[in-house]
């Protein structure tokens, strides 16, 4: 479940609000006209707190929201969902490139037609 209220993107707030050692997905953004505006979607497959504390955009975007997940697969799937939701609704994100599968895992995006076509092509190639 995503946090209902955006948090300030500062090291003190991140350390207080984000539990160390848990994977998760996050959105960096800003408040415009009283609403949170998505600007960057990302994830950590191992420790969301560390990812946010060391993020290149730590001081560029003033707010973040996040959700914990159980593992790297779920982090990839939720990041992909949020990324596709933004693109499908005309939201321009800073990160235009589709989320990558976690290291050493060949996961396919469940929301992406390209990913589905690639999976089918690989399956057909292996079967022949």
Model-derived regions, located:
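Boundary/linker segments flanking structured domains
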Residues: 1-38, 43-128
């Amino acid at each position: 479940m995503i946090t209902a209220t955006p948090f300030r993107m500062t090291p003190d707030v991140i350390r207080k609000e984000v539990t160390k050692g848990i994977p998760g997905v996050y959105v960096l953004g800003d408040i415009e006209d009283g609403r949170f505006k998505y600007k960057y979607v990302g994830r950590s497959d191992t420790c969301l707190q560390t990812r946010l504390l060391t993020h290149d955009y730590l001081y560029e975007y003033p707010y973040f929201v996040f959700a914990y997940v159980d593992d790297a697969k779920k982090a990839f799937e939720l990041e992909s969902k949020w990324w596709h939701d933004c693109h499908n609704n005309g939201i321009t994100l800073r990160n235009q490139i589709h989320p990558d599968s976690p290291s050493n895992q060949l996961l396919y995006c469940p929301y992406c037609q390209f990913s589905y076509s690639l999976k089918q092509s690989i399956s057909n190639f292996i079967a022949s």
